[in-house]
Regions:
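Transmembrane helix exit motif
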Residues: 60-73, 113-135, 235, 257-267
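Membrane-water interface of alpha-helical transmembrane segments
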Residues: 46-52, 105-108, 130-137, 243-247
């Protein structure tokens, strides 16, 4: 596969991630699926799961800058991170181990539905009402395991899951965003490890530049582009109204989600 399209994808995902504060996975996964299908680099049955696995590996490195920035700003609620991150990490790792067993069409449909939900949230600018106290051990474990599993299955770092959850449990938005960014690194690392170790369970996935289910060639290009573009995205976000950006991207994501759902019918 040519390096330029991968670098371009990294630039776009980093730019949008910096502008909108979203996980790059919502851009990387559908774009990689299209690139893999056009290049015939992987078989059609493996395209979706490889795109998800590679996305998780990309997010490990691209989320470092966001986590560091939030740490320096002093907005991270470490007591919340300590309660949730072990369960999110476990859920993401389990997703990496089990998702390769999913039927290709089912996996793509599930990701399409998730993207459809994210698009709706952006278009409607929806935020949950802060109405409950933070849960105890059982509630934290169930929340973390389920949220981590969805994050790992969809190839995202968890921000689209973590932030609404924390706000729902009465955590201020800026603290929820900061804590989510901090949790993104271990969640993505756990998911990527699961996909790397889970690869031997999937027949027919092998070749050069492959670490389990992670396409290292794609990872290199996307990561390089995202690291370059993310700081620029943050600067743009300070000059352009965030609500407008989210609605525009939400409309684009709606089209992507519908395409994902349609293409899942042919797998």
């Amino acid at each position: 596969m040519e390096f330029i399209p991968l670098l371009s994808l990294g630039l776009v995902s980093g730019l949008l991630g910096g502008m909108l504060g979203i996980g790059g996975g919502v851009v990387i996964v559908p774009a990689l699926i299209v690139l893999y299908e056009l290049s015939a680099r992987h078989t059609s049955a493996d395209v979706t799961v490889i795109a998800v696995a590679t996305s998780m590996a990309c997010i490990v490195f691209t989320s470092f800058s966001a986590a560091y920035t939030q740490f320096r700003a002093g907005k991270v609620k470490f007591e919340l991170v300590a309660k949730l991150v072990p369960f999110f990490v476990l859920g993401s790792f389990l997703a990496g181990l089990s998702t390769p067993y999913f039927d290709a069409g089912l996996l793509r449909a599930l990701i399409g539905l998730f993207l459809l939900l994210v698009a709706a949230v952006m278009l409607l600018n929806w935020r949950p009402n802060a109405s409950r106290a933070f849960p105890g051990v059982i509630g934290s474990s169930l929340t973390g395991l389920s949220g981590g599993y969805v994050s790992g299955m969809a190839g995202i770092a968890g921000g689209n899951v973590i932030v609404p959850t924390l706000v729902y449990f009465n955590v201020p938005m800026h603290n929820a965003t900061a804590s989510s960014s901090t949790m993104g690194v271990p969640i993505a690392l756990a998911g990527a490890a699961g996909y790397a170790f889970g690869a031997p369970m999937v027949s027919g996935v092998s070749g050069e530049w492959m670490l389990g289910l992670i396409d290292l060639q794609s990872w290199l290009g996307i990561t390089a582009g995202a690291i370059i573009a993310a700081p620029l995205g943050v600067k743009i976000a300070h000059r352009v109204p965030g609500d407008i950006l989210k609605r525009v991207f939400g409309g684009f994501l709606l089209l992507v989600a519908l395409r994902m759902l349609y293409s899942s019918l042919s797998l």
